[in-house]
Regions:
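Bacterial N-terminal signal peptides that target proteins for export
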Residues: 1-9
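N-terminal signal peptide c-region/cleavage motif recognized by signal peptidases
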Residues: 17-19
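A short, N-terminal "cap"/entry segment at the start of jelly-roll beta-barrel domains
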Residues: 22-63, 146-149
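Double-stranded beta-helix
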Residues: 27-30, 120-149
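Conserved short histidine dyad/triad with adjacent acidic residue
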Residues: 63-80, 114-115
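Glycine- and acidic-residue-biased ligand/ion/polar-headgroup-sensing regions
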Residues: 70-73, 80-98
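Short beta-strand His + acidic residue motifs that chelate non-heme Fe in jelly-roll/DSBH
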Residues: 75-77, 95-96, 113, 118-125
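Short acidic-glycine-tyrosine-enriched beta hairpin
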Residues: 99-116
Length: 149
């Protein structure tokens, strides 16, 4: 009988943990959704840049955001302590990582930015550039200052 109780207890714990995992609601967003809360980018990025948190806590690991800048916009040279996985949703964006050739992103294209890699970008004239970015660690952005910029 003791073995039977162990099996039942284990099954109950498994089912309860499955229910707990499913308690977080699924979600889907377009960058045009009115319910998104857009906030400012770090101060070193010119006015016009906005970020909307889609999922997670920016102070913790595994946060997803939309990053939006208007057309004809320069994103200054910077780096992150976290790696970032990106998909361009709108616009045309040229991204240049230090020591590598520039990559011209079109909607639907994926890009990976390693942690600590310095990079800058230019959104082409026309549509705003909207990037979906999945950060592995807490979100930050450090400007590259001085002659190395």
């Amino acid at each position: 009988m003791s073995k039977f109780l162990q099996v039942i207890s284990s099954a109950a714990l498994f089912l309860m943990s499955s229910v707990t995992l499913a308690a977080e609601p699924a979600l889907a967003h377009s960058f045009k959704d009115a319910q998104l809360e857009w906030g400012p980018c770090p101060d070193f990025i010119p006015k016009g840049c906005e970020i909307a948190v889609l999922h997670g806590d920016p102070a913790k690991a595994n946060t997803d955001v939309f990053f939006k800048v208007p057309g004809n916009f320069v994103i200054p040279n910077h780096w992150h302590t976290s790696a970032e996985r990106m998909v361009l949703v709108s616009g045309a964006l040229q991204v240049t990582y230090e020591g590598q050739p520039a990559a011209s992103l079109k909607p639907g294209m994926y890009a990976y930015g390693p942690a600590g890699a310095r990079h800058e970008a230019v959104c082409a004239a026309g549509d705003p550039c909207v990037l979906f970015i999945a950060f592995e660690g807490p979100i930050d952005a450090m400007p590259v200052e001085g002659p190395e910029q």
